[in-house]
Amino acid sequence: MALTLTTPPEVNTHVVTVLAPGPAISGYFKLGSTRNPQGDEISLTSRSLLFNGAPWFPIMGEFHFSRYPRAEWREGLEKMKAGGIKIVSTYVFWNHHEEVEGEWDWAGQKDLRAFLEACRDVGLLAIVRCGPWCNGEVRYGGFPDWVQNSTRWDPVSRWGLRPEHPAYMASVKRLYQQIGSQMEGLLWKNGGPVIGIQLDNEYSGPSNYLLGLKNLAFEVGMDVPLYTKTGWPRMEDAMPEGEMIPLYGAYPDAAWESSVQVSEGLLYNYIFRQQRIDESIASDVNTIKGGEDESHRDQYPFLTAETGGGMFVSYHRRNRVDPRDVASLALCQLGSGCVGMGYYMYHGGENPDGRFSTLQKSNEIGDIFDITIKSYDFQAPVGQYGQIRPHYNWLRRLNDFMGDFGAELARMPSTLPDGAEKDFSNPDNLRWSVRSDGVSGFLFVNNYQRLQRMPAKLNTNFQIVLPGGGQTIPRNPITIPADSFFCWPFNLDLNGVN
């Protein structure tokens, strides 16, 4: 009888070399009051946020109080907390509160103070995005019509710079005074939930405007540990070191883009990478493409404010977000070195009625797209009517993981294999990364791409070369299933056992 020899299948071993991380940098951040009356302290280094001096991995979700019924705030906040959210972020849309100059409305579901008290009562921290310009798919980005169309200062353009005109800045100061009054007694230093504020949004002009807003905020009493800005778009000049913390983002789709095609930028969001920003964000309102200069990236921790929890639907670009689109994108952010996850949106809502107009973006006022007049559901994990979507549960598992292992992850930079960011649109390439402190860590794999089938990867294992020696995982090669994504631990110390 003839003897048949079979050739074993070729093993696809993927290799990465991990170096021991260098020391974190601290001492140059210009923060507000960092301690609360109980003595708890929030601070940061170049690597992560710190809580009482220990690495801290915050998990944040966006929920717009003025877009949701006041009577249902607490239920919505409790759903967020149950989903693993620790911090609530919210916009203060100027035109929701001062549609007519000098007539302020903080009543009902527009009551910021009551919302922050609800956050406190549920046990959630808060970051308030103060504007004056916000976006959020709101009419004029949140500018009241009387601001947008005023002849008392140079025209305020959503497409360009927000000017430093004295009369305009005086109006902004009154807005900040109102917001400061709403937050009085609720700041971190008072024992309240507000640990930070964001100044303006998606600003591309000179840095002195944002610095002026920071000074105004502090002057009217908004003294908080963290002052933030979006890490996009590129500004005219670099923000002075340590003044504001850039927060980043990435989305599964871009309903604001004029094209109906899938852009390369959106494909790029499903790989592990060094670049922190989704360059397609806010391409409708900014002519300057790209994130800010990342040459100083290592001076700041990689925190996000807008990891897409879904996407709104525009008239011309009617996207449908799959739960895996959201969960795998968040995993890619985590595997790329994120040390603080912020979802936009986490809880959907509905635009309030304006006194003189509807309050959504539209072609009628010069926007390049139309969206729904009332709904701001965003296909979020918690929807416009409080409904729980499948990706709520996908993200809850990821949030629980970040909550349990956040302190370890915050000490572990991301390392990418050679060529990880090249030919990223090729579905046959395996997308993976490692986060490690040089001894132990986590392996991240994303074999998923929105709107594109990703084939199984056969006979696969990984060789992780650490300072103390190499490790191959798993010992026996496996097949990575099509359209899958996951993370594995390695060498973790479990009460003395690795």
Regions found by a protein language model. Give the residues of each.
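Acidic-and-aromatic substrate-binding clefts and catalytic sites of carbohydrate-active enzymes
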Residues: 40, 65-71, 97-98, 102-107, ...
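Short, solvent-exposed loop/turn and secondary-structure capping segments
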Residues: 72-74, 100-101, 129-131, 137-142, ...
